[in-house]
Every structure is written in structure tokens, then in C-alpha cells.
Swiss-Prot record:
Pfam families: FAD_binding_3. It comes from Klebsiella oxytoca. This is FAD-dependent urate hydroxylase. The gene is hpxO. Disruption phenotype: Mutants fail to grow with hypoxanthine, xanthine or urate as the sole nitrogen source, but can grow with allantoin and allantoate. One of its GO terms (molecular function) is oxidoreductase activity, acting on paired donors, with incorporation or reduction of molecular oxygen, NAD(P)H as one donor, and incorporation of one atom of oxygen. InterPro entries: FAD-bd, FAD-dep_Monooxygenase_BioMet, FAD/NAD-bd_sf, HpxO. The record marks 204 as: Involved in substrate activation for the transfer of oxygen from the flavin hydroperoxide. One of its GO terms (biological process) is purine nucleobase metabolic process.
Length: 384
């Protein structure tokens, strides 16, 4: 039995590993010649960590996951704590620690784990079709591949999604721009073992520790889409948007490198009613394009891969397995997309009265409510 996996990112590679572990031969195709992650880092929460370990890639997370032991929200003007608490109760309840990981390291290590030579690069898919014995897929270079079934893990701009859904869904602008990158840890900005977030005015500035003594940082600003901003104006743009913010935020703006800082207009897509058509299944961002507001995009792709691989361990009935995959994943990923959207709206001042109420809640937060919410999301995954 042979699977065609379209996409060599986190979703595609984890799917390929899961299928290989189930004894299925996979061919992996990637559109670009060199994968460059869109964001500087990825949040791998305990549900994702469990999935990586389940797939046999736990060492990658242990090597590159940052020491995120505490969580704090800070006032945007004074830089003083609104709330600060240990994440130890979350680790105890979920059986794993949260691991922010540099995206480039994660991508590279997963690629090495699978085998770089086992990925066909420069293969941009144009279409697919099913036939009695399996599936065919065509690429822009005129080549074609055949397999018994196909996993479309070709990202949020998936070319194969319309085949599965029967329509082309529109991406929805979430209403804010995100700048992100990596800087050396500076305790004058934030503790090196803490996820620190400054909030105010419907904006946020956040830092998470990753490997090699670095912070993953991001700035969020509610803005119209399509503004003429690029790296040449980046520091000035951030200085303007965060004028008057706390000294730590100003230090971060001064410390970042505009040439390695990403600027992304954040989108999501309305959750889908289906993830499968016949012998073709959507996986990862192709199947559930979400905002990053609860940090579950990468974790959801890993969950997809675990469910898919485990189902094929139990059965070789392709149609039946893919139906079960859809049944097990549709509600879960819908929940994650909509939770992220709700969190996005509160964080970014869609209704400033609600956002101000959240800021006030943070002043009385002991950690219990936030940890309960995180645990509910994490424990909804396939590995508990």
C-alpha cells in the first residue's frame, strides 16, 4: 500500500512518519525547493509533545523546547505584573510541559528524521483524481504520481482543498498584523523561564523562551489588511504602534533585527464540514486554518497525524479508515479554530468593552482559570 503525501511541512512530515510507523509506504512531495517557515517559532503544548513522542520524535522537542515554567501578563504602560503564576499545575495535570520551539529547527529536524532524500522538492500540485485502484496527482512540471490514497497537507493555501470540499473557501482576515522573530534572552526585558505578555489598547507584545538562550517574540496590532509596510519601516512602525508602552517593550523593539523579523497578516478559514472525499484527506492547515491565538495550529496537525497513523495500524480499509479519521477530527479541529477566533477577538479589541473587562480579570487572576482553560484544550486531544 502506498500513500501520497502532499506537503513537506510539519503536517505532511508527521503524517508520513505516522503512516510509515503503521507499515505504509509514503511518497512525500513539497512545492518549494527549500522550506522556509512563516513564523519564527511554534508553540507545542503538551498535547503536541505527546504526539511527537508517540510518533517517535520526542527527542526533537526535548532538544529545542524552551524552559517555559511561568506565565505572566503585564500592564502595557508600567510593565508591572497583572498576574504571574507557575505552569507546574498544568504540567502535572496534562503529563507534559509546554515547549515553544524555533520553527526552523523543528522543520529541519523533522525533515532529517524522515529523510531529506525521501522528499521530492519543487513539486507543486495542480490537481488530483480518483480511479478504481487509487489516486493520481499532477504537478506543475508535468509529472504525475499514483498511489492508493492521498493526504493533502499542502497548507492554508491548499490546492487540493477544493477537490475535497467541492468549493473554494475564502480566507478570513482576523483583523490584526503579527510581527515575530527571535532575539537573545535579556532579563531586563523578561525572565528567561517565563511566557511574558504585555497587553493594552487591544494590542499585545509577547515573549517565550526557546532553545539556545533565545526569546521567540511577537507583536500584535489591530490594523487594516494591505498596508504598505515592510522590513525597511519595521522598527519605526513598531515604535509608532507601541509609543508610550513599557520600557521592556522599547528595549525589545531596539533589540530585534528587522531583517529576520516576519510581518504576517493573520487569517483563518471557517471550519469545514468534511475533511475527506473518497481516498483524499485534508490534514494540518489544509484542513483547519486557524489564527495562532491559542497556539494549537501545529499541535492540531500532529494530532491529525497520530489519529491517521493509529487508524491504519488497525485496518487497511482505506475508505473506512479515512471516514473514521474525519469523524474523529472534524469536531476537534472545529473547536480549536473557533476557540482561537474567540480568543483573538477578545485579545485584539474587536469589542473593547470585552477586552477591557479581560484586562480587569487579569488583575485578580490566580492562574487557576487560565490553567483550567489550557488544560481543557490540551486534554481534548487524541492522547488525552
Amino acid at each position: 500500500m502506498k500513500a501520497l503525501v502532499i506537503g513537506g511541512g510539519i503536517g505532511g512530515l508527521s503524517a508520513a512518519v505516522g503512516l510509515k510507523n503503521a507499515g505504509i509506504h509514503c511518497e512525500v512531495f513539497e512545492a518549494v525547493k527549500e522550506i522556509k517557515p512563516v513564523g519564527a517559532a511554534i508553540s507545542i503544548w503538551p498535547n503536541g509533545v505527546k504526539c511527537m513522542k508517540h510518533l517517535g520524535m520526542g527527542d526533537i522537542i526535548e532538544s529545542y523546547g524552551g524552559p517555559m515554567h511561568f506565565l505572566a501578563y503585564k500592564d502595557y504602560l508600567r510593565g508591572e505584573d497583572l498576574t504571574q503564576f507557575s505552569l507546574a499545575p498544568l504540567v502535572e495535570r496534562t503529563g507534559g510541559r509546554p515547549c515553544p520551539v524555533p520553527a526552523l529547527n523543528l522543520q529541519r529536524e523533522m525533515l532529517d528524521f524522515w529523510g531529506r532524500d525521501a522528499v521530492q522538492f519543487g513539486k507543486r500540485v495542480t490537481r488530483c483524481e480518483e480511479h478504481a485502484d487509487g489516486v493520481r496527482v499532477w504537478f506543475t512540471d508535468g509529472s504525475m504520481a499514483e498511489g492508493d490514497f492521498l493526504i493533502a497537507a499542502d497548507g492554508s493555501h491548499s490546492a487540493l482543498r477544493p477537490y475535497v470540499l467541492g468549493y473554494t473557501p475564502e480566507r478570513r482576515y482576523a483583523g490584526y498584523v503579527n510581527w515575530n522573530g527571535l532575539v537573545e534572552i535579556d532579563e531586563a526585558i523578561a525572565p528567561g523561564n517565563q511566557w511574558t505578555t504585555f497587553v493594552g489598547e487591544g494590542k499585545r507584545v509577547s515573549l517565550m523562551p526557546v532553545s539556545d538562550g533565545r526569546f521567540y517574540f511577537f507583536f500584535d496590532v489591530p490594523l487594516p489588511a494591505g498596508l504598505a509596510e515592510d522590513r525597511s519601516t519595521l522598527r519605526a512602525d513598531l515604535s509608532r504602534y507601541f509609543s508610550g508602552w513599557a520600557p521592556q517593550v522599547q528595549k525589545l523593539i531596539a533589540a530585534l533585527d528587522p531583517q529576520t523579523t516576519n510581518r504576517i497578516e493573520i487569517h483563518d478559514i471557517e471550519p469545514f464540514e468534511r475533511l475527506v472525499r473518497g481516498k483524499v484527506a485534508l490534514l494540518g492547515d489544509a484542513g483547519h486554518s486557524t489564527t495562532p491565538d491559542i497556539g494549537q495550529g501545529g499541535c492540531a496537525a500532529l494530532e491529525d497525524a497520530v489519529v491517521l497513523g493509529d487508524l491504519f495500524r488497525e485496518s487497511r480499509d482505506i475508505a473506512g479508515v479515512l471516514r473514521q479519521y474525519e469523524a474523529q477530527r472534524c469536531d476537534r479541529v472545529r473547536d480549536l479554530v473557533l476557540k482561537a477566533r474567540k480568543r483573538c477577538d477578545v485579545t485584539h479589541g474587536k469589542d473593547m468593552a470585552l477586552t477591557q473587562a479581560w484586562y480587569q480579570e487579569l488583575e485578580t487572576e490566580t492562574g487557576e482559570r487560565i490553567i483550567n482553560g489550557l488544560c481543557e484544550t490540551i486534554q481534548g486531544g487524541p492522547l488525552g
